[in-house]
């Protein structure tokens, strides 16, 4: 009779990764699980940073780096990452390669969905746990095809300051501007979902997702972005006479577009900061022309005037920020400047969390 190994079996599929962040008494974060397989690579470190959080139970954040060999994804690459934050843990997720490159998909008559690169991320966040996910932007090369799905499951049984918290940045550029690329890829699809877990199973498996079919969840937010040229390059005629880019028309005049999602008590001040910044912007028709009051002095241009953005509160205090800028440098300066001006991320997670900005 074969003896069953007490150790977890290795990941079978290429590109899969699993991370479980636990907390050892009294408040020492520890990665109880960290596995990955080519072409995915996961690196971690504990920074020399002591959080100055208002929460006395806040633990020291752990940094996780998501990398891929070659700095990008080839056609057919499938990345699947599962992350679990057990109660009171804090995790910073970044991509230290400068950008996530999406390499070209070669045109072929028999092209299928498997020819495009794909990335899936699922994160489970326990009570009083916090995720700060600030990756570098995606850079889709000309003729590339890419899809990503990011799912965040938060514990909805906790109330007040014990709720889960998350900050998620998702942004994409027009391509390699140094080579003249300007939204010349075929497809970029991104979907972000936040689910509220109403009835988690009262054991460790509830955080690892082993009993997902028994869980009671409800959708808090679903945000999708589809950039599709709506053309087929599988025929010689289409390749020789490429149509005008629909993606370029729809994103003009922006060279970068992105989404920032904020939820939970750790990012409550940051959420209010973005909403207040947006509501303070001048509006067309806001001036009372019947008044004899002198016109306001025109303020000098700043990064708020160089970036188009909106900020709105949705259900359960979640804030959704959408932004667009002419180029990556402007977007970085605006977003990085705003996050540093408010100060929550640097205070709770350290300045290293803002490395992509």
Give names to the regions the model predicted.
Residues 2-138, 142:
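N-terminal, charged/glycine-rich beta-strand/loop interface patches
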Residues 27, 159-162, 200-204:
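Short, solvent-exposed loop/turn segments that connect beta-strands within catalytic domains
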Residues 42-44, 103-107, 143-145, 178-181, ...:
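A short, polar/proline- and glycine-enriched secondary-structure boundary/capping micro-motif
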Residues 170-351, 356-357:
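A structural signal for small-residue-enriched, beta-sheet-centric alpha/beta enzyme cores
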């Amino acid at each position: 009779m074969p003896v069953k190994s007490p150790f977890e079996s290795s990941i079978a599929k290429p590109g899969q990764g699993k991370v479980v962040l636990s907390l050892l008494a009294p408040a020492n974060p520890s990665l109880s699980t960290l596995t990955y397989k080519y072409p995915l690579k996961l690196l971690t470190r504990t920074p020399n940073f002591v959080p100055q959080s208002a929460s006395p139970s806040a633990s020291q954040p752990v940094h996780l780096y998501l990398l891929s060999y070659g700095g990008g994804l080839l056609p057919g690459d499938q990345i699947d990452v599962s992350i679990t934050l057990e109660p009171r843990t804090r995790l910073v997720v970044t991509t230290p390669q400068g950008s996530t490159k999406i390499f070209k998909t070669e045109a072929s008559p028999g092209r299928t969905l498997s020819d495009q690169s794909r990335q899936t991320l699922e994160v489970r966040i326990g009570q009083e746990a916090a995720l700060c996910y600030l990756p570098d932007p995606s850079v889709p090369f000309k003729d590339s095809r890419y899809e990503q799905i990011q799912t965040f499951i938060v514990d909805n049984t906790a109330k007040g300051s014990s709720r889960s918290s998350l900050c998620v940045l998702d942004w994409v550029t027009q391509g390699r501007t140094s080579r003249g690329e300007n939204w010349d890829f075929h497809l970029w699809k991104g979907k972000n979902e936040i689910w509220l877990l109403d009835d988690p199973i009262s054991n460790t498996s509830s955080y690892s997702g082993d009993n997902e079919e028994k869980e009671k969840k409800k959708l808090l937010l679903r945000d999708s972005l589809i950039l599709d040229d709506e053309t087929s390059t599988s025929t010689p005629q289409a390749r020789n006479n490429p149509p005008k880019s629909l993606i370029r028309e729809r994103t003009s005049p922006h060279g970068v577009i992105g989404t920032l999602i904020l939820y939970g008590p750790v990012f409550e001040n940051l959420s209010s900061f973005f909403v207040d910044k947006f509501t303070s912007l001048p509006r067309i028709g806001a001036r009372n022309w019947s008044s004899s009051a002198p016109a306001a002095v025109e303020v000098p241009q700043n990064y708020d005037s160089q970036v188009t953005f909106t900020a709105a509160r949705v259900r359960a205090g979640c804030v959704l920020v959408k932004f667009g800028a002419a180029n990556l440098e402007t977007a970085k300066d605006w977003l990085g400047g705003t996050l540093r001006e408010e100060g929550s991320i640097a205070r709770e997670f350290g300045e290293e969390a803002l490395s992509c900005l």
